């Protein structure tokens, strides 16, 4: 038989359908129906949402992100219960930096088959949306039979009044930088972590905090913005660490000097640096080192801002000051 001759499925007794090819449509439909019990709006061809009232010139702000190789830790631990919250956090924390309130979230999950792990991921996504105060408007769960591992992406849209957009233009020399505590690694630097795991330098059983979900800063940011208009800039500390993310909220001609001794770096980062023999500057460029989000405020609002942040249950420190670039 030539390589391009068709197989005789009838002779072999094969009735080819999607399930035989590896995609179970019925299981997928059942999965969607279960999701509808907690998120009634999903399942249509497109999600719809009404623009909230009270805006004169509403601006929509959108962002997309993923969780990177943190998914590999989920596989090692066989625990997918928190990674959905990470996905929401990575998107929401970006969108709120300009002062936007999260409005809705969409997800994309690619999997070999719809199983309990996918259900756990979705539960985490719904929990993340609840914390962020946004609607889960829809998404796509794609079955790829030849795919070995899971992959996922998230998409978030927020809304802000045009005149209240925070773009860093109000930042001036002498303004202070407040660092908000992270819950751990969040969702960055896991390629180094996975390398250390494969080289048996660290073990997940000794460090379950590797799966601690990323902090969602939307509630505390909303509180700060509701309290007044003195938040001049905000930055989500992700890949690139403070050195590459904090400057993104500063106007041209200004820089921030950060005191890395202003807070205590969590032990997990010290362990990674020690076991991997990672250079100190590389640690700063890869990991958040305990600071997951930054806000820039005038010096006379420093203490008030920090009091509000702590009142919301998040620790914080004055970690830097704004100067003119030399």
Model-found features: residue ranges?
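N-terminal glycine-rich phosphate/pyrophosphate-binding loops that anchor nucleotide-derived ligands
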Residues: 3-96, 133-137, 172, 177, ...
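Short loop/turn motifs at secondary-structure junctions
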Residues: 99-101, 192, 230, 315
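Glycine-rich, charged/polar anion/phosphate-binding loops
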Residues: 44-47, 138-143, 160-166, 217-221, ...
């Amino acid at each position: 038989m030539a390589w391009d001759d068709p197989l005789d499925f009838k002779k072999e007794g094969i009735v080819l359908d999607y399930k035989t090819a590896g995609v179970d449509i019925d299981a997928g439909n059942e999965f969607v129906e279960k999701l509808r019990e907690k998120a009634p709006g999903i399942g249509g061809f497109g999600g719809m949402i009404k623009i909230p009232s009270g805006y004169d010139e509403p601006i929509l702000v959108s962002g997309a992100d993923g969780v990177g190789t943190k998914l590999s830790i989920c596989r090692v631990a066989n625990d997918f219960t928190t990674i959905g919250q990470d996905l929401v956090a990575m998107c929401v924390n970006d969108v709120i930096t300009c002062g936007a309130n999260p409005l809705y979230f969409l997800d994309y999950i690619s999997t070999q088959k719809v199983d309990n792990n996918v259900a756990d991921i979705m539960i985490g996504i719904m929990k993340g949306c609840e914390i962020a105060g946004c609607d889960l408007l829809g998404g796509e769960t794609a079955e790829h039979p030849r795919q070995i591992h899971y992959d996922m992406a998230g998409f978030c849209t927020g809304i802000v009044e045009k005149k209240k957009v925070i773009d860093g233009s109000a930042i001036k020399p002498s303004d202070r930088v407040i660092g908000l505590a992270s819950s751990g690694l969040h969702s960055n630097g896991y390629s180094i972590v996975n390398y250390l795991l494969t080289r048996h330098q660290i073990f997940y059983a000794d460090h379950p905090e590797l799966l601690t979900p990323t902090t969602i800063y939307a509630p505390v940011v909303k509180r700060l913005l509701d309290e007044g208009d003195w938040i001049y800039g905000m930055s989500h500390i992700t890949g690139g660490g403070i050195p590459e993310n904090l400057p993104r909220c500063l106007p041209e001609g200004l820089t921030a000097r950060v005191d890395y001794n202003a807070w205590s770096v969590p032990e997990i980062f010290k362990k990674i640096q020690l076991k991997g023999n990672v250079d100190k500057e590389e640690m700063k460029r890869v990991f958040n080192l305990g600071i997951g989000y930054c806000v820039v405020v005038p010096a006379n609002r420093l203490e008030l801002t920090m009091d509000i942040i702590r009142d919301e249950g998040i620790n914080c420190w004055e970690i830097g000051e704004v100067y003119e670039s030399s």
